[in-house]
C-alpha cells in the first residue's frame, strides 16, 4: 500500500500552485526558488519561502522515481554537527539497526540552526522518507508538530522538545554533570568554571543544572564570571577558556559540557604549555562525552562516558517499533546511563 501524502496545516498536501498564489508569483518562480533561487530576486525568494512554511508545502523529490506501492526505504537522520566525530558514531548506530530492517539512512546537518533544521526536515519529507530521527537544535520545534509532519514516525535523540509527544532517547545529563562536578569538588577545587551550550538547548540546560546542583549542595557559589556558554566548535571553546584563564581570579578546574568544548579547552591548555606555562598552574578538566586521544591529556582529566553508537541504535529501535505498531502507542522516553571515567587523576 502506498504511503499517504503528508498533510499541510489545513489537513491536505498543498500544491505548488497554491504556494504561488499565496506568494503572488508564478509556479515557475516557486520551482526556481526551491531549486536554489537562480535568477530570482531575494525579496521574491523570501515571499516564496514564507508561503512554503505557512502552507507546509514539501517538494516530492522521489515522486517520479517511486513506482506505485513501493516504499522509498529511506530514514532521515538530522544531526547538529557533521564535523563532530561523536555524531558519526551516532549515525553508525542508526544505520546498523536500519540495515536489519532493509532501510538506508540519509544524513543531514543542521548546524544548531532552527531555520536550517526546518528546511532539512522539509527536504527529507520531500524525499518520501519513511521515518525521521533528529537531534533537535532548539527546545521548541513547530516544524516537528503533527500538522507539519503528519503521521511520519519520528524520534528525538539526545534532546527533548517540550510539548511534542514523540519517542525520545536522552542521556542522564543532569546526573552526569553532577557527578563530574562533584569529582572536581572532592579533588579540592572550589572555583570551577563551566563551558557549555546555551540554556535554550535541552542538554545545555540539563548539564548546567547538574553542575549548579553539585556546587550549591557543597555550599559553593555559582560565579557568573566563570560560566561560558554558546561555544559550538573547538576554536570558540579554546577562546572561551582563554578568557577565563586571563581573568583576575581564574578557575582551578573546568567542567565542560560536551566534547567540542573539552577538546577546545585542551587545545588552549596545550598552547599555554608550549608557551612555557607549568601544567600544574593550569586547570583540571572534567568533560561530558569521551573522545579519542583523551588519554594524552597533559592535565588531570576525567570524562562522563557513554556510547553514542548505543544512543543511535536505541533511537533507531524506537523508530522501527513505532513504524511497525498497528495500534496507537503512547510516546516513550528512554534515558541512557553515563559513567565517570577518570583518565588522569
Regions found by a protein language model. Give the residues of each.
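Short beta-strand segments enriched in small/hydrophobic residues
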Residues: 27-32, 66-83, 183, 191-198
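N-terminal helix-turn-helix DNA-binding module of bacterial transcription factors
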Residues: 1-71
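Bacterial carbohydrate/catabolite-sensing allosteric modules
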Residues: 1-9, 54, 96-101, 149-156, ...
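Short beta->alpha connector loops
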Residues: 111-114, 135-140, 260
Amino acid at each position: 500500500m502506498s504511503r499517504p501524502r503528508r498533510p499541510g496545516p489545513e489537513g491536505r498536501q498543498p500544491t505548488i500552485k497554491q504556494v504561488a498564489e499565496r506568494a503572488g508569483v508564478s509556479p515557475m518562480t516557486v520551482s526556481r526558488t526551491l531549486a536554489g533561487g537562480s535568477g530570482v530576486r531575494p525579496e521574491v525568494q523570501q515571499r516564496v519561502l514564507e508561503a512554503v512554511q505557512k502552507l507546509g508545502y514539501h517538494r516530492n523529490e522521489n515522486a517520479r522515481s517511486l513506482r506505485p506501492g513501493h516504499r522509498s526505504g529511506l530514514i532521515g537522520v538530522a544531526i547538529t554537527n557533521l564535523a563532530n566525530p561523536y555524531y558519526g558514531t551516532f549515525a553508525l548506530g542508526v544505520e546498523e539497526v536500519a540495515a536489519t530492517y532493509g532501510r538506508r539512512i540519509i544524513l543531514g546537518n543542521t548546524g544548531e540552526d532552527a531555520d536550517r533544521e526546518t528546511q532539512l526536515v522539509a527536504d527529507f519529507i520531500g524525499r518520501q522518507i519513511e521515518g525521521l530521527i533528529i537531534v533537535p537544535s532548539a527546545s521548541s520545534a513547530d516544524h516537528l508538530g503533527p500538522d507539519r509532519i503528519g503521521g511520519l514516525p519520528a524520534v528525538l535523540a539526545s534532546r527533548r522538545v517540550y510539548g511534542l509527544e514523540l519517542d525520545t532517547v536522552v542521556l542522564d545529563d543532569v546526573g552526569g554533570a553532577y557527578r563530574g562536578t562533584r569529582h572536581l569538588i572532592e579533588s579540592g577545587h572550589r572555583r570551577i568554571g563551566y563551558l557549555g551550550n546555551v540554556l535554550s538547548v535541552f542538554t545545555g540546560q540539563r548539564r548546567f543544572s547538574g553542575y549548579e546542583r553539585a556546587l550549591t549542595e557543597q555550599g559553593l557559589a555559582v560565579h557568573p564570571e566563570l560560566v561560558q556558554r554558546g561555544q559550538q566548535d573547538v576554536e570558540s571553546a579554546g577562546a572561551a577558556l582563554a578568557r577565563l584563564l586571563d581573568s583576575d581570579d581564574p578557575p582551578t578546574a573546568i567542567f565542560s559540557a560536551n566534547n567540542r568544548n573539552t577538546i577546545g579547552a585542551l587545545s588552549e591548555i596545550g598552547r599555554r604549555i608550549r608557551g612555557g606555562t607549568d601544567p600544574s598552574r593550569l586547570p583540571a578538566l572534567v568533560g561530558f562525552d569521551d573522545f579519542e586521544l583523551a588519554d594524552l591529556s597533559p592535565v588531570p582529566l576525567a570524562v562522563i562516558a557513554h556510547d553514542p553508537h548505543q544512543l543511535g541504535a536505541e533511537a533507531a529501535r524506537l523508530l522501527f517499533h513505532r513504524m511497525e505498531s498497528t495500534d496507537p502507542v503512547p510516546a516513550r522516553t528512554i534515558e541512557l546511563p553515563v559513567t565517570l571515567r577518570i583518565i588522569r587523576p
